[in-house]
């Protein structure tokens, strides 16, 4: 397919993960809620990146990464919507995304790696400040993933949300550096 696209001047764009978490990883480790899944994903990324390094230079790491918040099974192979599990899985996918960016740039410095979210435009019901704030908070649920992938750090509003909801969250120095170095 790539050869045919290139023959007609079409540059392929590859999405590395599009809702297909292997059931073996779900059964063995609980999928993306376990950080060991990152290494499995990176072996896959390296394999695909090496194989198609002369044919593909446009990549997306995860399709609609933010969908993990409301559809954990589809987006990350998580059979529940427990906030702690979702936060852990999101962290692992975001670290995997950053490591994928680094890996793909090491394979071919010309690679361009991006991200995408599933997003529907949001409007406040009225111009009342409470409606506007609610709309902003809902938008941040989606923007959070872009913020981390593009800026390389967890935004304060998400850390405060975790704190309010009793989610235990931390990043060690190595993880912080990975997020910072692996921006899209």
Model region roles, listed by residue range:
Residues 2-184:
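Active-site region of glycoside hydrolase catalytic domains
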């Amino acid at each position: 397919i790539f050869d045919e696209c290139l023959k007609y001047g079409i540059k392929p764009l590859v999405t590395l993960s599009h809702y297909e978490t292997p059931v073996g990883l779900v059964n063995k480790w609980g999928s993306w809620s376990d950080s060991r899944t990152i290494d499995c994903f990176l072996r896959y990324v390296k394999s695909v990146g090496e194989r198609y390094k002369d044919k593909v230079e446009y990549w997306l790491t995860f399709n609609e990464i933010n969908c993990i918040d409301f559809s954990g099974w589809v987006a990350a192979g998580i059979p529940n919507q427990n906030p702690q599990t979702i936060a852990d899985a999101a962290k692992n996918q975001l670290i995997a995304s950053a490591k994928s960016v680094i890996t793909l740039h090491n394979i071919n410095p010309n690679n361009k790696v991006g991200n995408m979210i599933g997003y529907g435009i949001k409007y406040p019901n009225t111009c009342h400040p409470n409606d506007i704030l609610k709309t902003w908070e809902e938008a941040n649920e989606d923007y959070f993933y872009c913020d981390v992938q593009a800026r390389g750090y967890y935004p304060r509003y998400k850390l405060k949300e975790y704190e309010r909801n009793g989610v235990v969250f931390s990043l060690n120095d190595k993880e912080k550096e990975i997020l910072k170095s692996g921006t899209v």
